[in-house]
Amino acid sequence: MIQLFRVVISEQIIDNSEPVKCKRRTTLGKSLLFSRVLYREWWPATYCSRVSGYRDILPELDLVLWLIKADDRALSVDEYFWRHILQCGHQQVLFVVTQADKTEPCHEWDMAGIQPSPAQAQNIREKTEAVFRLFRPVHPVVAVSARTGWELDTLVSALMTALPDHAASPLMTRLQDELRTESVRSQAREQFTGAVDRIFDTAESVCIASVARTVLRAVRDTVVSVARAVWNWIFF
């Protein structure tokens, strides 16, 4: 079933509000996954028993993480929700195949090397491809094992890419230290400056006076450069 995670609520570029909210469903490994990825608690939301409850909250979300267990073969409810309830929000969804270490043959998982056996790797590949064929999402399907830590860095990279630029840096500050790599920090910084840059696009589009547009263009590069320079000070 669908899992909704509120990564950033506000449309502001800098936001320290509740970073993550979840719509509950048991046995998917949500708690373990997020405790391995985030160093702060995530806030579980109340269960939505009505379709309208999901529809009401979707516009508030920057990203939806849709969790599917690696050994889950019954996806008819997920498919119905995707096609009939989610409607126009497909670009907000990142599919994650969880508990990859339980993929058959599960006894072959390499605990020392923290990786699947060749047979498991093939089955995981087939699972992610099957999920992609069924849902045709905008973003690639990611497979992870929260219990072993396998591919959590890939999940973080996918999250950063899928998030709107204004939401990447607030999420990055809440990652576990080992996942907040220089590459992730660099990506968040560039997305932050990109968000600042687009503010000028919006401002120019609503400016009627040519003088005002000229002034905006003159200060644009300076402001974006300053934003890049002070990024570390703002978020750390």
Swiss-Prot record:
Entries under SUPFAM superfamilies matching the protein: P-loop containing nucleoside triphosphate hydrolases
Biological-process GO terms, alphabetical: tRNA methylation; tRNA wobble uridine modification
Record-level GO cellular component terms: cytoplasm; cytosol
InterPro entries: P-loop_NTPase (IPR027417)
Gene3D superfamilies on file: P-loop containing nucleotide triphosphate hydrolases
Family: To E.coli YfjP and YkfA.
Name of the protein: Putative uncharacterized protein YeeP
